[in-house]
């Protein structure tokens, strides 16, 4: 009898070996098929069969520069090694990028691991959806992000900025002998973004600017304090090949689970309260299409041809709350950093805004009447895009045209490449925004003036077909639905802060700023504990 456990153990081991061998065989067949259908491309040598070049990219202080170096050496389209011997095609050719984005959600879809991650932690909303499901959800949300809707909610952005001003002024008044005080600005930008998306999107004031406790803000802040350890990094590296590893407990997964639960509770509460309010109005339950939550309720109506399920409604709220908080706060923080580094630019912007001493710019003026504010904002979006790359998988065999002929690994010169079904293809979006070949020798520098003169100074960047020749909001069917919302908030808040305060680094403009891993990469002053950016702030007389 004592031998039975060993027999059972041996049986389990044999079964695992057989399963792994079967997986390896199927994977080999898929790899052979993909490679036989894909044009052989040049690329940097692999550092490891298990990790490919993932660790090199992950550990690099400037992965965008790494992608650019490889493009210079191997051509505007090349391949890099991925974990477990797989390959990824990298597109740095504008024509090829346009082709991929034009076929997004149908012929090029998200990776399996991305969809599993999004579905698990944020629900089956617009970020998760593909094809017709994505098209339907996007149409349902579009009214909430029209120009009319954004014009109506722009006062919310100004209100958040003035609440922050009131808090800062109170600090000055409690320190009457100090003309300048140190303020950790990133925390305040987080509060502005959270309160703005709460009020403008969901008619809910989180009150974070006034210091009101918020469960969702606590979770957001936790991501900045808990950095991924070696185990977590290994798990995410291999999860693309073994998606089941996404379920392994670790500190980051625990935070995403907590974030999901917290936002879910808030979304349920906000949705229920809005439904009750709408029931008392004429045509109860149909909502106000000018608000995000109103559009969601309208789309949930059984009579709507764009009907979305309650699960999808909650998922949209999860994604919009996260996106509205994270991306804008990062961009605002980077704006204050660059303006602190460049006091001449800061003063030029203040001079342009000086005519609004007694009133605020209208939405129309923010959009078209303040060219230098527009230039500063778009230079920040170019130089410091919140997302670093777009990764897709070919759902079918495809042929991608090239703007610049390319020499393949076999020595042939081609003006298009074949991509086999199942091939992973990526676009290094932040790298493209800074590519010297597109933006000139000063591509890595903060130069708002490049956006003036009808954008004639953009050189070859005009070949990029995305919004304002940037890939910050990507392009095609998945182009960021909330870009108008984000830009209006960015401009409104920045216009208030620059009119009333000056900003500089306590240790001078050469202060080193590094990346800090959070939900998205955030800036932080080197040496700070957490994603902190302390600046010396003075009131403008």
Curated annotation (Swiss-Prot):
Disulfide bonds: none annotated. It is found in: Membrane. Pathway: Secondary metabolite biosynthesis; terpenoid biosynthesis. InterPro entries: Cyt_P450, Cyt_P450_E_grp-I, Cyt_P450_sf, Cytochrome_P450_monoxygenase. The keyword Nuclease does not apply. The keyword Ribosomal protein does not apply. Its cofactor is heme. GO terms for cellular component: membrane. Its EC number is 1.-.-.-. Heme binds at residue 480. Keywords: Heme, Iron, Membrane, Metal-binding, Monooxygenase, Oxidoreductase, Transmembrane, Transmembrane helix. GO terms for molecular function: heme binding; iron ion binding; monooxygenase activity; oxidoreductase activity, acting on paired donors, with incorporation or reduction of molecular oxygen. The chain crosses the membrane at residues 12-32. It is a single-pass membrane protein. Cytochrome P450 monooxygenase; part of the gene cluster that mediates the biosynthesis of clavilactone A, a meroterpenoid that features a unique benzo-fused ten-membered carbocyclic ring unit with an alpha,beta-epoxy-gamma-lactone moiety, forming an intriguing 10/5/3 tricyclic nested skeleton. Cytochrome P450 monooxygenases claO, claP, claQ, claU, and claW are close orthologs, suggesting that a redundant function or pseudogenes are present in the cla cluster. These monoxygenases are not involved in clavilactone A biosynthesis nor its modification. Belongs to the cytochrome P450 family. This is Cytochrome P450 monooxygenase claW. It comes from Ampulloclitocybe clavipes. The gene is claW.
